[in-house]
Amino acid sequence: MFCHLVFVNLDPTAPALADESAFLSDEIMSYAPDLANLTHAHTLTYRIQANWKAVVDNFLECYHCPVAHRDFCTLVEMDTYKVKTHGIYSSHMAKAGRGDNKAYGVESASVTDHAVWYLWPNTTLMRYPGRGNFMVWRFYPDGPEQTYEVFDFFFET
């Protein structure tokens, strides 16, 4: 168990995720203290005609956000958006939950920050403004030009 989630490594000699990821657990639990109480609500799977490394690289930068994700940029205070790299993971944090945004309603939101963690090599953990939530996003390569993305959504009930 790691942050109330199950991670499996089939290599019996591999170091523990907690040892490899330094403060990731503390960081996640500080932004998502309700994680143990969230319920799995839905899974989405997409097939993308792109190399998985290009998909991950695109995710890891937000230079394209003002053009490709305009509503997201009204939800998140982009001038506070910071990316920090910590060994095998990176943190993407910003103040968020602006009531005047164009993305979706956040009135009475219990989550008011945008917090995302990319865990090398193919997992992203996300917390968006709104009601209690958490998303796990995985990238699976299927050849040099195709990637499967799987999103698991967890919400408060």
Model feature map: region roles:
Residues H4-T157:
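C-terminal catalytic domain of Rieske-type non-heme iron oxygenases
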